[in-house]
Amino acid sequence: MKHFTFADNYLRTYIDTVTFGFKFIVHPVNYTDLSISIMIGEQNLFNLVKLIPNVRKLHLYFTDENTKYNLESITKLTKLRVLVVFSQFEKKSRPRLYNIKSLNKLKLDSIVIYDKILDPFNPVYQWPQIRDRKFKLVKSIDIKGPIINYNVNRIRFHNHLFEKYPVCCSNFIVQLINQPDNTQIYQVIYRYQEQYIEDQIYIQTIDKSKFLRFIYGENVLNTEIYYPQCQQDLYIDDIDNNSN
């Protein structure tokens, strides 16, 4: 398998591994078995396709987690039979890919995207869910009848939340309790430990503004602001899963 990198819309290969000198390739190559690293930055994959018209087995390594790549250009490789896509970050990060579904036009023998074997005739990749950073302090949401329990990460809250002393504990359970008259009650459950005193579990009623501060991790002036009410609400609506 011949290896190249692809940068500045050209293939390139090392000619000196000491000084990292490159040879740029501007004309199509005849290799049928290729491994290509797509370098950081916006890279036009259509220009890559023009340089590798005879490839049958192609390994692509994507290196820029901040760039989204459109794979539709790959459908121009009419001789391609096997496509394998890797991330240079392995499992730590997976650069986003658009138009994976369009690869069904090639009727490939095999297609693998980030270790997932896809159906060549219906290639769909399910991206991992992305947490909404606005609610990074909320570990999970659990619903028990009229009660919504928010498991909040370890935080230190000061006197403006708790009248007597600052509170420091491993986590808080914040509850929203829906009443039959369509009103809500908010309360927090926490384990508070004082020096020389065995820790105890406390339950304290709070108002909505303090409830929202637990959810957002900061003061919220608008008490009508949106807040998550189920586990799925902690994740963003990922358009990539609807258009890949």
Swiss-Prot record:
For this entry, the protein name equals Robin
Q: Any miscellaneous information on file?
A: Has been named in honor of Robin Offord, pioneer of proteomics, at the occasion of his retirement from the University of Geneva.
